[in-house]
C-alpha cells in the first residue's frame, strides 16, 4: 500500500475515533457538543465562502486535520443576566458570535497537522461542569493524537500494508462556511449569527444587545452605544478622531488632551517656564523653545543658527555671537606665482554666494582692483599684474550681499623671465650677448657665464637700461651656460638660459727653425681649448704641387716637416679642429736651404790641375762656388762655376802646386743663398822633372840636366836602360837638377827617365834617349795610349838637334800625314784627337842645321773607345736598367760591373755588343750602387764610364681597409723588408685632391677618421727612408651609409608622438621608420629623404613604443638608430564633452566623439574648438558661407543637419542631452572680416521636447552686447511649430528657426546674407537688424572648465 493509501486510512480512522469519543462523552440533556473534523491539503485552493471539507491528497502534499468543537446551549436553558456578565468577562469584546479557543499539533516527519477549534456561544451560561468536562475532553484528544501518531509510525514502517483501508469516501456539505454538517441530523448546524438550511442567512450579533435594531444582519445602535453588537458605550464626539474610546472614556493621542481630545497639549508642560495656549508654550523672558526648556540666544541667532544652552551654533558660512557676520575664508594660500599672475586657494563653506578678491600694490599710489568669483570656487588666478611688485591681497566671502571680514596675504609677483636672449659676436675668449628690455622698473641685470662642467664661471651685473654685454676672459672652445636674471631688491627673476661655445683657439706663435734643404722644424704654442687634433698644412707658395696635410694629436706642439724641395719658398699653417669646427690658422713662410752638390769626385788630375765633377743640386741654382786651398790653409782660392746643363757640373782647378793635397768645398749659390759645401780632399800629381836634356856624353858617361820639379819631393829617381835591356837606377837628392851617369857601356843607346818621388807617390817620368859617344835618335816610345791620344817619348840625339819634326797619320791614310814641329829640347809629345782603334804611323826627324837625319819610325794603335751617354732607368727595389750609346770602334762585348758603394763585392756581367741596354737584377733594396761600363775587344778594354744609382725601397704589401664605419676605417699593411722612416698615405675620393697623411715607420696600421659617409675612397701608400721612396700600393673601400642622428620623440600625447632626427651627411633616397609596441604590433613607414620629422598618429594609450630609423640609398642601408617613448593615458576614458577631450591632451580643433554621461552607447560626433578662450568648446551651430539651408522644419532642428566641419545645426535633442550633464556656459562668436565680437553667458541649457526645448541662460559677458536674454525661457519655434507669442509666425516671417518671442533680438538661424530688416543673421546689439553677420559660431562648455583645467595643470606641475 502506498503513502496515499496510508493517509486515507489514517484520516478515516481519526474521523471515526473523534466522533465516537465526542458522542460518548457529551450529555444531550445539557450542552450539545458538535465536533467537525476536516482534512485539507496545505496550499489548496480556497473557495468563496469557506474551505471545502474534503480534498483528495497527493503524495507530496502535507495533510492537515481540522477539529471544530461547537458547544450549543439549548434555548430553553438560557442563562440569567448574571451569567451573561460572567460570560462577557470570559470572551473578548471583539468577538461577534463565538468565543474561540484554538490549538495545533504538528508532526513534521509525516507532514500531518492537527488543529482544534472550540466555539462557545456568547452570553451563554457555561455547561455544567463545563471546565472539567472540557479539560477531560482535551486530555483524551491529546491521548488520541499520541496513539494516532504511534499508529502512523507503525504504518510508515510497513506494518499496515496488508490491511490498509480502501474504498470511496463521500462528499460532506460545507454549510456555506458558516456551520458544520451533522451526521446525526444529516444537516447543517449553523454558527452563531447565521441560520438557514445552508447557514447562509446572517443574524445580528447578540441580537444587537437589545441596544439597537438589526437590519440585514447589521446593528443600528442607540445614540449612547456603539459597536457591532451595540454593546459599547459611545465617547464624547467620538474623541474628535484623536483618541481611543475605552468604556466610554477617551484615551487621547499625543499631543491632544481633554474629554473629547480637542485640546492641544504643550510639550513638557512648558518646563514650568511658560504657559500653554492651545498647545503652544508662551515662554517667560529669557527662555525659548517649544517646551521653554532652552535659554534664549542673542538676537535669536539672527535666524542663521541654532541656540544651544544660550549660545548660538551658527549655520555654515556665518559666525559671531548672534550669527550675524559672514565667516571669512580660511587657510588662504598661494598655489602659484608667475611674473604677471598669482594663483590663490582657500577653504570656504558651500553656502557662500560669491567671493570678492581685492588686490593692490603696496607701493604708494597703487590702484586697488577687485575680482569676483562664484561661491563654489575655492581658488582664483589674479592675472594682468605687474612683475616684481608686492601686492596686498584680501579675500572676502559674500552671502546675500553681506561681506565677511577679509583674510589677507602679502604676495610679490616674480620678475619676468628675460626674453630674446641671443649672441651677437663669439670669439675664442669673448661672447657678446644681448636681450630684450623690460617695460617695468627694476634694479638691474645679472649675467653669468658658467662652464658646462660647473668649474668656475663669471658673474657680472649691469644697470637696468643695458641690454647687451660683452664678456671677456673666457676659455677658448669651452661650452658655457649663459643665464640672464633681472634683479629687484632681494628678488631675482627666473633666468633665461642658453648655451654657447667659444670658438676654439688655434695654435699661436708659429715658428720654423732648423731649416735645411729638405727638412724644417715647425714649432707653435698649442691652443688652450681641448681639440681633437692639430691640422698642419704646408705647400709651395703659389700653390704648385698642392698642399700636404698632417693630422697631429694634441698636445703635440712641434713637428719636423720632411721631404721638402731644396731652395723653395714654403707656406706652413697650423690650426686646431674639434668636431666640425676649425680654428683660425697660424701661418708663416720659410725658404728651404739650397742642397749641396752631391757625389763630388775627381775626374782626372795632373801635377797642377784637378778635374772636379759633381751631381747638381736639386734646387734651381745658378752657379756653384768652389773654394780650395792646400791643407795647410796658406791661401784660399775661390771660383764661381755656372751650373751644368746636364745632371752634373764640371770644373778644373789649375795652377795648383804639384804633389799637394788640397781641400775642396763646393757650395750651391742661388740669389743670396748659399748651400753648405760639399767637401773632399784631392792631391795633385807630383810634378815631373821638365826639360830633361843630355848636356854631354862620353864613351862611358852621359850628363843630364832638368828643370826642378815645383812641388815638394823627397828625391829624384833616374832610371837608365841600355839597349841590352838591363835597367839601372840611381837616386838623386831633391835639390839637384843635374846628374852625370858614369860607368856606362861605350857606344850604347840608353833610355833615361827621371821621376820625382815623394813617399810612395811618383811623378810621371821625363824620358830622353842618349848615346854614349855620338848617337842619333834610335826609336820612339809610346805610352798612355787611349782611344784618342798617345804619349810619345824619344832619346836625345847626340849631338843635340836644332829642331825636331814629328809626323803621324793613320796607316791607311799615309798621304794625309800630319806634321808637328817640335823644339829641339823636347823629348816627348802627346798626340791628341786620334781615332779610336786605329793604327797610326809615327816618324821623328832630327834637323841639324840643314841636315835632316833619317826618320825614326814607329807605329801605335789607339785604344777602343768606351760607350757613351750612360743612363739609368726602371729602378726597382732589386733591379735597374742601364742604357748607353755604343762606341765608335768595333769591339767584342760590353762588360757591366757594379758594386755597393759602401761594402760589398764587385759583380760584372758580359753584354753582347749588339745591345745598348741591360737590366741588372738581384740587387739589394734601398742600396746605392756604383755601376761601370766599358767595351772589350780581345784582351783590350776601353775606359770605363761610371754612374751611381739607388735601388728603390721595397714596397709595403697587403694593404687592406677593415673596421669600416660611416666615418672611419682602419688601414692595415705588411711592412717591407728594408728600414722604413715613414709611410705616406694619400687618401682620395671622387675628383677631390688627395689628403696626405704621414705615418711613423714602425706602424703597420692607421685609423682614418672624419671620413665622409657613403663615399668611395682610394688609399695609396708608399714607404720612405731619407730620399728613397718605395713603389706605391693602393686599396679601394667605401664608407658605410651613416645613420640619422639624435632620434627623439617629443610632443607625446595619448595617441600621437612627434619623431624628429638629424639627417645623415650622405645623400640618401629615403628613410625606413619602424615603430612597434610592447604588444607585438609593428608598422613600417617610408619617409622622404628631405623630411626630418614625422608625427605618428593612432597610437595606443599607455603603451611603450620603440622607434627604429634607417637611411637607405639604392640597396645600401645604414645602421639602425632607435628611441623609445610611452604614450600618455586619458584622464577621461570616455569624454562626455570637448573640455574633457582637452584635458585628455587633445589640443587640436576638429571632430571628436563624445559619450553622453560617459556611456559608450551614447556616442556623438561633435566639432571641438580647442583654441578660443582656453578651448574645450562644443560647437553646436555654425554659419559661414550660406551653403546649408537653415529654413527647415521641426524634425530637422530636433535631430540636427549639415556638416560639422562646415555649416550645421547639432540638433535640439543633442543639445538638451549635453546640457543635462551639468552646468554649461554659452559663447557666441561673430566675425565680419577683421572685426570680431562675442557674447558669453555663464549658464546655458535647453529643456526636453515635452517643454519644447525652452532656452535657459545666465549672466551676460562679452563685447557684442546682450541680445539673447530677450529670448530667456522661450520655447523653440520652426515654420511648422509656432511656439512664439507674436501674432504672426516668427519662423515663417523671418525664414529661420529660433527661440522666438515677439519676434527676436537675435536670429542666428536666419537667412544667410539677407540684409532686409530682421531677415538675416542678426545680433541686434552688435550690428542691428539690417545686417546679416557673415560668420557665427555657437558653442558651449562646462562652466567650471577654467578651474578644472587650472587644477589639472597644477597637478601636472606637482
From Swiss-Prot:
Signal peptide (UniProt feature, chain positions): 1-31
Residues bearing attached sugar chains per UniProt: 36-37, 55, 176, 180, 198, 271, 278, 302, 392, 470, 581, 791, 874, 1036, 1046, 1261
Cysteine disulfide partners in this protein: 292-301, 297-312, 314-323
Coiled coil start-end: 127-157
Ranges of residues in domain Fibronectin type-III: 328-420, 421-505, 506-595, 596-687, 688-777, 778-865, 866-955, 956-1042, 1043-1130
All copies of domain EGF-like, residue ranges: 188-199, 219-230, 250-261, 281-292, 312-323
Any one biological process term the GO annotation gives: negative regulation of synaptic transmission
PTM annotation (Phosphoserine): residues: 724
All copies of domain Fibrinogen C-terminal, residue ranges: 1129-1344
Pfam families reported for this sequence: EGF_TEN, EGF_Teneurin, Fibrinogen_C, fn3
Keyword Transport: no
Localization terms from the record: Secreted, Extracellular space, Extracellular matrix
Record remark: domains: The EGF-like domains mediate interaction with CNTN1. The fibronectin type-III domains 3-5 mediate interaction with BCAN. The fibronectin type-III domains 1-2 and 7-9 mediate interaction with SCN2B.
Function: Neural extracellular matrix (ECM) protein involved in interactions with different cells and matrix components. These interactions can influence cellular behavior by either evoking a stable adhesion and differentiation, or repulsion and inhibition of neurite growth. Binding to cell surface gangliosides inhibits RGD-dependent integrin-mediated cell adhesion and results in an inhibition of PTK2/FAK1 (FAK) phosphorylation and cell detachment. Binding to membrane surface sulfatides results in a oligodendrocyte adhesion and differentiation.
Family: Belongs to the tenascin family.
PANTHER family membership: TENASCIN, TENASCIN-R
Disease: Neurodevelopmental disorder, non-progressive, with spasticity and transient opisthotonus: An autosomal recessive disorder characterized by delayed motor milestones, delayed walking, speech delay, axial hypotonia, and peripheral spasticity apparent from infancy or early childhood. Affected individuals often show transient opisthotonic posturing in infancy, and later show abnormal involuntary movements. Variably impaired intellectual development, and brain myelination defects are present in some patients.
Name of this chain's protein: Tenascin-R
Gene label: TNR
